[in-house]
A protein has these predicted regions:
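Beta-strand signatures of extracellular beta-sandwich domains
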Residues: 58-60
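Substrate-binding/active-site clefts of carbohydrate-active enzymes
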Residues: 118, 138-151, 160-341
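Aromatic-lined carbohydrate-recognition surfaces of secreted/lumenal glycan-active proteins
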Residues: 347-353, 357-373
Length: 385
């Protein structure tokens, strides 16, 4: 069945949107993004996206010849959350959001909550159902819940999936092949954990993956999301833990990504003295914005819960903590107390740790932090008055 104009209306629950706007929707990926759904007996896909400044949004793809406006979304909250159900769409269909900005421009954006993406040079999102994978790591998970996370021995092997080892023709191994190659080596060398340089979707093949455009999608360069689940499952079966680099500090300016998502700052801090890392050419998340907190914390929990990742190595924490990081005098503004600390980022990191470790005390939170800021990886308890 070819997708047609939306003809089936659904009533979205108010609770996910309310929690999202409060900064407390820790599983926002279950609501936002593209999800298989059946309405009035017709299977299709429901799309939801947050775009507070957009004048109009439509879903475009091969199914409608990428024609703007042919499948318009509507606001479910009268404010900033848009939805559309399209009958007949199916898994692996490619799509983007065509956003009409307040300036009258059309911008084509990948889905911030997409579970799967096209490979370079294309950058569209793909409909994907992450449910139904048969995990076999119950014994590993049970053992981890009894482990001494703080004091237990660890020997970590850091690696980049795409360049660790190449096969004939100078091609990287896919997730399945990589697991088969990696496990004997890690076992022989006596490592307890593998730490993966970022495997969240990113645009440039030649990079290490630190400029993330897909915070809920393992890079499709090496397979599907379930292929990556299988990779983790195989390592757990061999007694090897999996830690992944997670990048909440900044994101790139690629036009299809989060940057100026609806024509104006949404995910980035709107203050130019706080919202950009000029040396890196990237944008800084608006850590004080509730919707951004929901987005990032949902991403962290997504990898730990849906992919059974054992821990997160949080990248570039120092750049989050200090307003003057890599900035000269006059290029930054002090906080409300006159200091250089980014108070919103400090509060966010506390909230992140408390949420993750409150739900999963056996998971690892590891910070790349070069200034010896205390307690950046632990549960935070407010000091007694």
């Amino acid at each position: 069945m070819k997708p047609t104009e939306e003809k089936i209306q659904g009533n979205a629950s108010d609770l996910p949107v309310y929690l999202f706007k409060q900064g407390n929707n820790c599983e926002a990926y279950r609501y936002f993004g593209a999800h298989l759904e059946t309405r009035a007996g017709e299977p299709g896909i429901v799309f939801r996206v947050w775009a507070p400044h957009a004048v109009a949004i439509s879903v475009v793809g091969d199914f409608n010849s990428w024609k703007p406006g042919s499948h318009p979304m509507h606001k479910v909250d009268g404010d900033s959350v848009w939805e559309l159900f399209i009958p007949g769409m199916k898994e692996f269909d490619v799509y983007k959001y065509c956003v009409t900005t307040r300036a009258g421009d059309l911008v084509y954006k990948a889905d911030p909550y997409a579970f799967h993406a096209e490979t370079r040079p294309s950058n569209g999102s793909k409909v994907y159902d992450i449910s139904g994978f048969a995990w076999h790591d119950e014994a590993w998970q049970a053992a981890q819940k009894k482990a001494d996370v703080i004091n237990g021995p660890m020997n970590i092997y850091e690696m980049h999936v795409g360049s660790w080892k190449m096969k004939e023709g100078n091609k990287p191994y896919n997730y399945a092949e990589l697991a088969d190659q990696l496990i004997p080596y890690i076992t022989e060398m006596g490592y307890t954990h593998v730490e993966l340089l970022p495997v969240m979707e990113y645009p440039f093949d030649g990079s290490w993956g630190y400029q993330v455009t897909g915070y809920f999608a393992p890079t499709s360069r090496y397979g599907t999301p379930k292929d990556f689940m299988s990779f983790v499952d195989k390592l757990h079966a061999a007694g090897i833990g999996v830690i992944m680099d997670w990048v909440p500090a900044h994101f790139p300016k690629d036009q299809f990504g989060l940057y100026n998502f609806d024509g104006e700052p949404c995910y980035e801090d709107p203050n130019p003295k706080r919202g950009e890392h000029k040396e890196w050419g990237t944008m800084v998340f608006d850590f004080g914005r509730n919707e951004v907190q929901s987005f990032l914390i949902s991403s962290a929990l997504y990898w730990l819960e849906q992919y059974h990742i054992d821990g997160l190595r949080v990248d570039a924490v120092a750049s989050m903590l200090y307003l003057d990081y890599n900035r000269k005098q006059g290029e930054w503004e002090p906080n409300k107390d006159g200091g250089k600390e980014n108070l919103e980022a400090v509060a966010f990191l506390r909230k992140l740790n408390n949420t993750v470790l409150g739900r999963h005390p056996h998971k690892y939170m590891i910070a790349e932090e070069s200034t010896a800021w205390p307690m950046v990886c632990l549960l935070y308890t407010s000091p007694s008055p």
